[in-house]
Structure formats: C-alpha cells, structure tokens
C-alpha cells in the first residue's frame, strides 16, 4: 500500500497494491497488521454500501462525540468527488477540507478519522460506494453541514445536485463551532 498524507493531519489517501491479469484483478482493501504498521489501530464495527446515480450528493455528514466515526471509504464501481471537512474545534486546520477522486478504476481509498464531516458527489450512474466505520450509526448524534456553506467554499463542480430530503436541518460551520463551544464539546 502507498499512503499519502494530506494537508490535514490524520487524513490519508491510500493506494492499494493491485494485481491484474487476464482474469481481472485482486487487491487487499484492509489488513489490520498493515494498518497497524501505518500507525492506525482501527476497529471497524460496521460496513455500509450505497448505490447512487450521477449527480447525487451525500453529506456532509458527521456524528458527534462520543459516537464520532472514523471511515475508510472507497468506490467499487463508478466514481465520486469525495470530501472530508475538519470539524475538530481544537484543530489548526478546523474548517479546512480535502477532496479526492475515488473510482472503481483507480481503487484509491480515503481514511477519514473521527472529527470530520464527510460527503461525496457521484460522477457516474450506478456508482457503488463502500465505507467501513469505527463506530455504529447513532441517530441521536448525527449531524450534517450545509454542502454549499459559503465559509467552506467547496467547488463541487455541480450546481444542482440530487439531495436527500432526510437532512433539512443542515448547519453552517460557524454555527457548529458556536454550538460546540456552548456545549463545552471542544
């Protein structure tokens, strides 16, 4: 595996070794010992998979502590523009984001530790997205940042995405920080 650090501490882009021949390909997407050698002592408890058509926007989701999730994400088929926003209030990179293209073709993976909002926009029809989570889903702790938050200035390369009706109460980053400070969750 080739691991690339990003401009945001703890956020990693991972390229697995892929073995291809006339039958197809094989690669190891997760190995506990390999990740331990990278300094990642992870305990995944839930795997999720979604299927989306082109132009679907999912995110920017997060779970509040103590249910904050780490996620190892990848695309099985199709492609996405994947984005992680640092919402760790004491982080020097608070409010900054990293974006990466994940696809079934490039097989790139993205490690997103707890304390990040995460989302993606699908770039192709029938995109299959997979994520391994370190903490189970907890409805009471879930939250979402507004994908078009003017503070973030994320260029999604799409003006009218297909959005979920599930998250009408998305927050602005500025309000999220105020809430964390008010609740002493910093």
Where are these regions (language model features)?
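Conserved metal-binding segment of the jelly-roll/cupin
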Residues: 102-124
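Non-catalytic, conserved peripheral segments adjacent to functional cores
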Residues: 1-105, 124-126, 133-186
């Amino acid at each position: 595996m080739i691991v690339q650090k990003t401009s945001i501490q703890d956020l990693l882009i991972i390229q697995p070794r892929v073995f291809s021949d006339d039958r197809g390909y094989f690669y190891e997407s997760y190995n506990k010992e390999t990740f331990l050698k990278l300094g990642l002592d992870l305990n995944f408890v839930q795997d999720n998979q979604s299927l989306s058509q082109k132009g679907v926007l999912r995110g920017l989701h997060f779970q509040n502590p103590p249910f904050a999730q780490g996620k190892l994400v990848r695309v099985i088929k199709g492609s996405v523009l994947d984005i992680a926003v640092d919402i760790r209030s004491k982080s020097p990179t608070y409010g900054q984001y990293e974006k990466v293209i994940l696809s079934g073709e490039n097989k790139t993976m993205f490690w997103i530790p707890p304390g990040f909002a995460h989302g993606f926009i699908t770039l192709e029809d029938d995109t299959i997205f997979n994520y391994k989570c370190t903490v189970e889903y907890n409805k009471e702790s879930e939250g979402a940042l507004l994908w078009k938050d003017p503070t973030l200035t994320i260029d999604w390369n799409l003006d009218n995405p297909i959005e979920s009706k599930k998250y009408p109460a998305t927050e602005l980053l500025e309000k999220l920080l105020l809430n964390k400070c008010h609740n002493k969750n910093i």
